[in-house]
Amino acid sequence: MSINGGMTEQMIVPESCLIELDSRVPVQDACLVEPLAVAIHGFVKTKTKNHHRIAVIGGGTIGICTIAAARYLGCKVDLYAKYDHQIEAGLKLGAGELNGQYDRVIDCVGNDDTLKLSVNHCKPGSWLVLLGIPLKGINLPGLKTIMNEIKVLPSIMYSSTDGVKDFEIAAKVLAKFPNIGKTIITHRFSLEESEEAFRVAADKTSESIKVIFDPNIS
């Protein structure tokens, strides 16, 4: 994230940075390993197990990837999303409707409204994981957070834990659910269509989730 060159045609990286991709996964969908790793990191840090009930707040790329990661772990997961097309994507990956309190609430938005909603759906002693970036500061309902001893994890994208990289687990998620790309990647463009691709990605009315450049499109 801190090194220039992400838009270059070629990049040299250390071999240790490479992750093997299952042959069932379309190469053009391999870009989903990155947002999946963001989701995995939050679950790894909170030691999430298959008996934990998960709520995902936000139906963008990270939110929908978090649903996939939760399903990979064997968890029951529900989604709160703003737009109908995001709710539909969540349903396709097995998410239900937000209801009650949860062992893990994953806020993939990070604004005041979603943080308040997230705290309201946290069980006493549960984890609130911040995958969305609160650009204007973190404003949590103080009394409820303290009285219920809600643990808050600000997550720094991804890393490795006990020698296992989040990217490696993310690649396994993609291998188990190779059709994730059809759900999350809503728009594909050639490199020549870059201006339109960025326009669609920024347009809230385009019903986009993940917009990518696909080298197979000419």
Residue ranges and their predicted role:
Residues 56, 72, 129, 133-136, ...:
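C-terminal capping/lid region of NAD(P)-dependent oxidoreductase domains
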Residues 1-18:
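Glycine-rich phosphate/adenylate-binding loop and adjacent beta-alpha elements
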Residues 17-27, 100, 151:
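Glycine/charged-rich beta-loop-alpha catalytic/anionic-binding loops adjacent to active sites
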Residues 10, 31, 55, 59, ...:
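Glycine- and other small-residue-rich loops at beta-strand/loop junctions that grip anionic moieties
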Residues 138-186, 195-196:
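C-terminal substrate-binding/catalytic core of Rossmann-like NAD(P)-dependent dehydrogenases/reductases
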Residues 26-99:
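Mid-domain Rossmann-like dinucleotide-binding core that forms the NAD(H)/NADP(H) cofactor-binding site
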Residues 46, 53, 87-151:
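Glycine-rich cofactor phosphate-binding loops and adjacent beta1-alpha1 units
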Residues 8, 18, 39, 102, ...:
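A general structural signal for well-ordered alpha-helical segments in protein cores
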